[in-house]
Amino acid sequence: ANGRDAKTKIWGLVYRPSNFDPTMKYPVIENIYAGPHGQHVPKWFELRNRSREYAELGAIVVQIDGMGTNWRSKAFHDVCWKNLKDAGFPDRIAWMRELASRDSSVDLSRVAIFGGSAGGQNAMRAVLDYSDFYCAAAADCGCHDNRMDKIWWNEQWMGWPVDESYARNSNMEDAGKL
């Protein structure tokens, strides 16, 4: 699918239950880790795969590399500079809408998201800023305020010294939106 700019290809994977019935509607669970130091869509076989495990519970699970992740181009990656809260959400949502337009079993009225560490931060941000799309989130060990997390990691993506962009990207500052 194309991303927010309507031309950049966004890559992702879809996991369906092994007893998938194309006539049924399935909730969607996004497995997210939008840390800018890597990409999340697996490029290799994994013996143990949490996305596969959740799909077996009766959901369609997706993993998407939105803008802000690396290994594509500098412009693609720079979306996250001082903007970790973006997490590629406009691209992720466009990708899932494209999936639903091609697959009638995808129920976009039931989209949940989960992640750990930076993925936990992303999962919480999904329901803070995109609650019209994501109806539930599970955030494991999220670094919800980059002013209180390991600075060596954060200053790579947020810069130094700490400035107003840290507050703009803080889930804690926006917790009242829940």
Predicted regions: what is each one?
Residues 1-178:
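Serine-hydrolase catalytic core recognition
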